[in-house]
């Protein structure tokens, strides 16, 4: 089970990689980010903290830092997901794909696989898809306009925005 969002750019792969590898980069393009602080940077073993607009905080633990992006684990007391940031392309154009692989047991309070699947398809998947679309749209806006996005720029999210 996963959700993903992809964006295409008429920009060099190296530029896009540089943007997603900047410490604290979510401050510039994540529409639900209150603050993003790097504690250890860069490369494998990097750690940062993402605080959402609603005050919820998660640590992000980076691994598999490669020439095409990185993977990270995000969570608090529980690991909520593994997230893949992957860039492919050339010196003229490229794409960014962000995939969220949730640890479904930490989203659903039921152990029954059937109930987990129902929750996944009817509630969790649409919420995560909306979330990752907003994040990738924020990144696309940021790199295309060379300006930071506003909080909730593409609409609020019930899990991460403050109401």
Question: Where are these predicted regions, by residue range?
Answer:
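Short hydrophobic/aromatic-rich motifs at helix boundaries and adjacent loops
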Residues: 6-7, 31-32, 55-58, 107-112
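Glycine-rich portal/gate segments that line the openings of hydrophobic small-molecule binding cavities
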Residues: 27, 37-82, 93-95, 130-145, ...
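Beta-strand/loop substructures that line and gate deep hydrophobic ligand-binding cavities in soluble
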Residues: 76-134, 150-152
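Beta-strand elements of well-folded, non-transmembrane domains
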Residues: 11, 54-56, 66, 89, ...
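Short amphipathic alpha-helical segments, especially helix-boundary/capping motifs
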Residues: 22-24, 34-36, 58-62, 111-116
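Hydrophobic ligand-binding cavity/cleft-lining segments
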Residues: 1-42, 160-163
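Generic structural detector for well-ordered beta-strands
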Residues: 6-10, 61, 86
């Amino acid at each position: 089970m996963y959700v993903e969002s992809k964006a295409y750019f008429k920009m060099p792969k190296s530029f896009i990689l540089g943007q997603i590898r900047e410490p604290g980069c979510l401050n510039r393009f994540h529409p639900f980010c209150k603050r993003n602080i790097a504690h250890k940077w860069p490369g494998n073993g990097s750690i940062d903290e993402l605080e959402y607009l609603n005050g919820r905080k998660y640590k992000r633990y980076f691994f598999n830092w490669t020439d095409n992006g990185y993977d990270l684990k995000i969570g608090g007391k529980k690991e909520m997901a593994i997230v893949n940031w992957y860039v492919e392309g050339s010196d003229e154009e490229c794409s960014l794909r962000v995939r969220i692989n949730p640890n479904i047991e930490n989203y659903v309070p039921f152990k029954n696989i059937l109930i987990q699947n129902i929750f996944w398809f009817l509630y969790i998947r649409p919420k995560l898809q909306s979330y990752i679309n907003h994040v990738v749209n924020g990144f696309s806006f940021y790199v295309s306009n060379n300006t930071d996005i506003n909080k909730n720029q593409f609409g609020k999210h019930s899990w991460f925005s403050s109401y």
